[in-house]
UniProtKB/Swiss-Prot annotation:
A motif (Nuclear localization signal) lies at residues 446-451. The modification N6-acetyllysine is found at K388, K593. Residues 134-483 are annotated as: FAD-dependent oxidoreductase. This is Apoptosis-inducing factor 1, mitochondrial. Changing E493V: In CMTX4; increases affinity for NADH and electron transfer activity; increases affinity for DNA, resulting in increased apoptosis; no effect on interaction with CHCHD4. It comes from the Eukaryota.
Length: 613
């Protein structure tokens, strides 16, 4: 009895050892290549081995061998069936998840995920592929423009965007402009807004159905664009063309774009303050900041905006107009003499400041923050000149710090003057590495080295980087523009080096009812005015011959309805601001591209038809 059992166990061991050896000698890559049929994977080696064993066995062992064979084959068949059933169910579940997710907004997806989590259901996470041809680090405007450019030149391209932001790629300008003027009570959920021309659109570049699953990306025949949201690249290995994510996963690439953007700067006075001050301070940048500030604006009695640049002035006007109905006090303070004092000449900066005040904002120029604390439940801001400001909430809009953490592991150069990754005129930092958007310090072949933090630059540089990643080898020559709207009535577009420290010449005329951002979008059909620009460089425009004349300085207190401001360096126009003049950017671009000296800029201003009714 015991002998027979021992013989049976020994026979079974002899038959299983070759099987284990057959499976184990394979490398992980070879095992992955094995057919998915579990019966084939196990039965064939067993059958061959057992045939050899049975041929040398006596009649007394045949019965046991046959029993063992039947047992093994039966177990293998059952296992294969279970494996096939499990695989089919997983595929069905994955298919249903993809179908049910199509057309959902990020908010609806988040709500669905939260509901699943509350019911104890495991929420599936999109997994990163191990390799992609095109890897884009960052999920902003530059990355999306690059993805679109890559796919335009290579329709079968597989593009992966890795974004730290939980949202799909979206445009930032409406966060401080149109969204605040929406009459939709659910605007923070829908993130849809009416442009100044009354047309409605979403803040997202594309709906969720536009994108493919990241884990399916390598297997899709015609390629596509996938987005991994809520993931951060923490390490860049340029030698092995590999990145590491904050969840530990690794991705190899062939071409890589760094479009990491920037982080809002804070004030040292706020950084030194306690946790309560920081919790009641908004560093405005993302969708989450808009949602949070919109809610806060309806709950507090006073909001103070620190910063007098584009973002600070736009938010001040938006909150000021909104506060009229709520009775909220809106304060704006900054160290310059007037709004946008670093950009506009002093007379226009002062006029802009009065415009902001007419929107119901208490504007405090020449204000330098010394400290911030808490007193009797209020935030107390102390200024260097002794003035004090009490408020319920602070919005800091004091600039952007480029995200350059990857420079350390990637061995990339940071520009000591402008910040950002230092790249050449083709936006390339290293072999197979390009940089675009706010984080790129690039060489402008016309104006020298620069770093620009505007939407249109993100579009232009992202598009160029995408072209060069597919072999175009083009330099950065297209001058990007930027614009700012102080509500639907006053706005301006600018291009080139726009710095109030440069000499300026302004030519103005009386505005008509059509000279405002609202009318501009009615003509162009879009509130994101860079999207309405054509690729033409106004090549047929002829600059009129100059006649010596002395430019007349604008009269203080004048109502600057519309006009052109030229910024000069060595008597050459290097920057232009179009004040309430829209859809004339190709003309301004050509003037800067020509780089000629002009004796009478009044003649040049005629190109913009500012005296037309």
């Amino acid at each position: 009895m015991f002998r027979c059992g021992g013989l049976a166990a020994g026979a079974l061991k002899q038959k299983l050892v070759p099987l284990v050896r057959t499976v184990c000698v394979r490398s992980p890559r070879q095992r992955n290549r094995l057919p998915g049929n579990l019966f084939q994977r196990w039965h064939v080696p067993l059958e061959l081995q057992m045939t050899r064993q049975m041929a040398s066995s006596g009649a007394s062992g045949g019965k046991i061998d046959n029993s063992v064979l039947v047992l093994i084959v039966g177990l293998s068949t059952v296992g294969a069936g279970a494996y096939a059933y499990k695989t089919m169910k997983e595929d069905e579940k994955r298919y249903n998840e993809r179908i049910s997710g199509l057309g959902l907004t990020p908010e609806q997806k988040q709500k669905k995920a939260a509901l699943s989590a509350s019911e104890g259901e495991e929420v599936p996470q999109d997994k990163a592929p191990s390799h992609v041809p095109f890897l884009l680090i960052g999920g902003g405007t530059a990355a999306f423009a690059a993805a679109r450019s890559i796919r335009a030149r290579d329709p079968g391209a597989r593009v992966l965007i890795v974004s730290e932001d939980p949202e799909l790629p979206y445009m930032r300008p409406p966060l401080s402009k149109e969204l605040w003027f929406s009459d939709d009570p659910n605007v923070t959920k829908t993130l849809r807004f009416k442009q100044w021309n009354g047309k409605e659109r979403s803040i997202y570049f594309q709906p969720p159905s536009f994108y493919v699953s990241a884990q399916d990306l390598p297997h899709i025949e015609n390629g596509g664009v996938a987005v991994l949201t809520g993931k951060k690249v923490v390490q860049l290995d340029v030698r092995d063309n590999m990145v590491k994510l904050n969840d530990g996963s690794q991705i190899t690439y062939e071409k890589c774009l760094i479009a990491t953007g920037g982080t809002p700067r804070s004030l040292s006075a706020i950084d030194r303050a306690g946790a309560e001050v920081k919790s009641r301070t908004t560093l405005f940048r993302k969708i989450g900041d808009f949602r949070s500030l919109e809610k806060i604006s309806r709950e507090v009695k006073s909001i103070t905006i620190i910063g007098g640049g584009f973002l600070g002035s736009e938010l001040a006007c938006a909150l000021g107009r909104k506060a009229r109905a709520l009775g909220t006090e809106v304060i704006q303070l900054f160290p310059e003499k007037g709004n946008m004092g670093k950009i506009l000449p002093e007379y226009l900066s002062n006029w802009t400041m009065e415009k902001v005040r007419r929107e119901g904002v208490k504007v405090m120029p020449n204000a330098i923050v010394q400290s911030v604390g808490v007193s009797s439940g209020k935030l107390l801001i102390k200024l260097k000149d002794g003035r004090k400001v009490e408020t319920d909430h602070i919005v800091a809009a004091v600039g952007l710090e480029p995200n350059v953490e990857l420079a350390k592991t990637g061995g990339l150069e940071i520009d000591s003057d402008f910040g950002g990754f230092r790249v050449n005129a083709e936006l390339q930092a290293r072999s197979n590495i390009w940089v675009a958007g706010d984080a790129a310090c690039f060489y402008d072949i016309k104006l020298g080295r620069r770093r620009v933090e505007h939407h249109d630059h993100a579009v232009v540089s992202g598009r160029l980087a995408g072209e060069n990643m597919t072999g175009a080898a083009k330099p950065y020559w297209h001058q990007s523009m930027f614009w700012s709207d102080l509500g639907p009535d006053v706005g301006y577009e600018a291009i080139g080096l726009v710095d109030s420290s440069l000499p300026t010449v302004g030519v103005f005329a009386k505005a008509t009812a059509q000279d405002n951002p609202k009318s501009a979008t009615e003509q162009s059909g879009t509130g994101i005015r860079s999207e309405s620009e054509t690729e033409s460089e106004a090549s047929e425009i002829t600059i009129p011959p100059s006649t010596p004349a002395v430019p007349q300085a604008p009269v203080q207190g004048e109502d600057y309805g519309k006009g052109v401001i030229f910024y000069l360096r060595d008597k050459v126009v290097v920057g232009i601001v179009l004040w309430n003049i829209f859809n004339r950017m190709p003309i301004a671009r050509k003037i800067i591209k020509d780089g000629e000296q002009h004796e009478d800029l009044n003649e040049v201003a005629k190109l913009f038809n500012i005296h037309e009714d």
